[in-house]
Amino acid sequence: CGADCHNSCAKTAEMIADSVLADIRKPYDEKMTLMKNIALPKRYELWEKLGILPGGAKDEIFNAVVKTSTNLNSDPMDMLLQCLRLGISTGNYGLILTNLMNDIIMGPPQISMDPVGFRIIDPEYINIMITGHQQSMFADLEEKLESEIVQKSAELVGAKGIRIVGCTCVGQDYQARSGCYKDVYCGHAGNNYTSEAVLMTGCVDLVVSEFNCTIPGIEPICEQLDIKMLCLDDVAKKANAQLLPYTAEEKEKITS
């Protein structure tokens, strides 16, 4: 594939991203246009018939927060309908569409036989535990860790190298594409409910979080075991973590 193909793919990706963002940011009384393309036709017809097709996802979330605030909405049927609109928008955009875009960016998942659980953590390595939902935000980190210079630096301080330890949902994303990351990704250690136990092994040297599924219970453990914490998004900001807001333009600086 030549430069023209690359530019065309990049432009297509940009158009898709802009379309998704435009849909999500619409007001609640404007229906999201991509919904018809990604939802099952019969379900879409039913949602349309019932009048529960959601407007812009962010506005729907805002309305839900306001409705559940003190002394506001008290109609259970209205709130149930609000929940249905939230479920439709987040299920189709937050799950289906997000996964489709991840497949475009990083390739589709592949079925493989791989070890999981605490046994994948080797204490002889410098281990970076990742938590969150957005695998693409770790792409530059992963690329840097694969370099011989970085791995040699780890060896200079007595480690065998540096590895990424998968935890929470982003760990499952890595596991689904494990064939692409065998050099630095050692496997999926556990979900968000076992992330505290993963840290208690004493084999983790750094926690990098980028979004949700980063539970508050890891804070005292990291403090007690002197495990450094970095957050790439203030949504998952922990009290004792350093915040490094991620932007595509500054990804190399952040990784360094």
Regions of interest found by a model, annotated:
Residues C1-S256:
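Metallocofactor- and cofactor-centric catalytic cores in central/energy metabolism, strongly enriched
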